């Protein structure tokens, strides 16, 4: 039974998304349906966590909009994500960056990872 579930979910997994991790700044292009029309909405921010595995894997992106912190959680393998761009790679030592919620302004910046 377990192998059957794995076989079915394997077909649903996305392989077209770039590799990203907590601390990276990403731009997520989300398909939004309003009435009978569909449009693309862009959400740009820092990945503060990535959890789960397989089909149920999710990631949370945080941005500050007009002085208010906004966090949005996306399933990694959803067809609602049209495109995901990694803008910059962050250098962090934690898997969950919840401490960014308390930081304001320049203190909330993350060092950029240098290419090696």
Swiss-Prot record:
Gene Ontology biological process terms, A to Z: translation
Keywords: Ribonucleoprotein, Ribosomal protein
GO cellular component: cytosolic large ribosomal subunit
Family: Belongs to the bacterial ribosomal protein bL19 family.
Annotated NCBIfam families: rplS_bact
Record function comment: This protein is located at the 30S-50S ribosomal subunit interface and may play a role in the structure and function of the aminoacyl-tRNA binding site.
Protein's name according to its UniProt entry: Large ribosomal subunit protein bL19
Protein source organism: Geobacillus stearothermophilus
